[in-house]
Structures are given as structure tokens and as C-alpha cells.
Amino acid sequence: IFTEWLDPAVLDESNPSKRDPELDLWNPQNPNKPPFTPEYVARFRAAQVARNRRITAQVREKLAELDEASAAWKGDGSGNPGWQQGERDRAFVVSCTQADLRRLDTSLDPNGREPTSLLDLAKENHSPVGLARFTTLRSWLSQWSYDESNADGPKSLAQIKVPVLVVANEADHLVPLTHPRDMFEAIQHHDKEFHLVKGATHYYFGQNELMAGAVEHVMGWMRKKGFLEQEFVEAS
């Protein structure tokens, strides 16, 4: 899902203000507005993947430099390792990671969510906080790289042999219903259940009753499957 959130307008990772105007959702000269055409969606998604791959290439290049410096360090005769020898990773920033078209266009993967305003989405996308904003070279490859990360929900769930409960929020503005449904379908056995919480948003803000109902459903499922000790059930 991370790549589907990446802002593809960013042309220079060191300066996110250098942007492709036709992919910039906040550029008033961009003629593409919601509802977006299938052609624009395809172009936007391809550009998101391309940006992810550019970052991965930069990460690989920097890791190679670190490995080369570490291997070349001969020491200074003191017996103490140099910093070049110890630096096996490096932190970096990924700017602009909140530009999912679905936030603006609720006809894409429709559910019960409300559209996000451009201003609110800008606050998320342009701010110094956000998904994967601060990471490291190796963390990027492990968790966020489109081609190299093993963090693949459906792929992992296909190997699960134990009972599975998938819970989805019907009005979630961040996680489209297609994702939990894909995860559910990826499970190869039949001891699985899909539960949709009607009207629930991503964070359940102001939805205490829906939250309580979701928790009770999970608890009930765990009791039914024998995953809760009786003492814990009574205490809760």
C-alpha cells in the first residue's frame, strides 16, 4: 500500500519542491481533477512505482559505497576501528508519502469513506511526519522497496495454516477494501472469516460503539477458536 501513497510528482529526492506539474495534485495548472480518468490513474500509478524504484536504486548505490569504504579501511595503527568500518547503514528521509488518488476520488475502490480535502491531504503529504518519512537504507529494502521487500501480506497469508480472522473498516479512508479482501482470498484454507465493520473509519474517532463491537467480535472469534484462556476472558 505504501507505493500507492507515494507522491509521484517528486522529481528530486533531495528537493521535493521540484515536481512534475501534471502529476502534482496541488498544482492549479494540473488539468486532471477527480473523478480521475482510467488513463490518468494508470499513469499516476506507474509513476509511483517508478519513484519507488528510483529510491531503491539510490539506496543500493549508497550501500555499495558504504560497503566499499568499510572494506577499504586499513586502520591507523591504533587498533581502533574507523567510523568507515562500522557504518553499515545510514538514515535518510523520504518526503511526500501521502498522495493516494483514492483520498480525493471516492469512486476509486469505493467504500463508505468521505473524500479528503486537498488542504488536509497537503498537510499530511508535505509535513515532516508520515509513513516511512524517516527510514534507513536497509530498512527501505526490507520494508518499503516495491521490488525487494518481503513484506507482502497476500503472499505471506498464502502460507498460513492456522485459523484467520480478517477485519476491515467499511469507511476506512486509508486502507481500501480491496486490500483486506485480497488478503482474505489469498488464504488457502477454509478456516477463515471476513468481518466488515459497517461505518467504521480508520481510527474509529468518535465511534466508541463501533470500536467496542469490533473488539467484541474479535474476542468472540478467539473464544470460539480456543485462543483465549478462560481466566483472561473473565478478567476482560
Which residues does each PLM region occupy?
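Alpha/beta-hydrolase-fold enzymes
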Residues: 2-116
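Acidic catalytic loop of the alpha/beta-hydrolase fold
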Residues: 7-8, 171-175, 203
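Active-site nucleophile elbow and catalytic-triad environment of alpha/beta-hydrolase enzymes
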Residues: 8, 137-156
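Short alpha-helix in the alpha/beta-hydrolase fold that links the catalytic acid
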Residues: 12-16, 152-153, 162, 176-185
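Eukaryote-specific, low-hydrophobicity, charge-rich regions
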Residues: 100-145
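Short beta-strand/loop motif that positions the catalytic acidic residue
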Residues: 159-160, 166-168, 172
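Conserved beta-strand scaffold positions in the cores of enzyme catalytic domains, especially
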Residues: 194-196
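Catalytic active-site module of serine/aspartate enzymes centered on a nucleophile-bearing elbow/loop
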Residues: 198-236
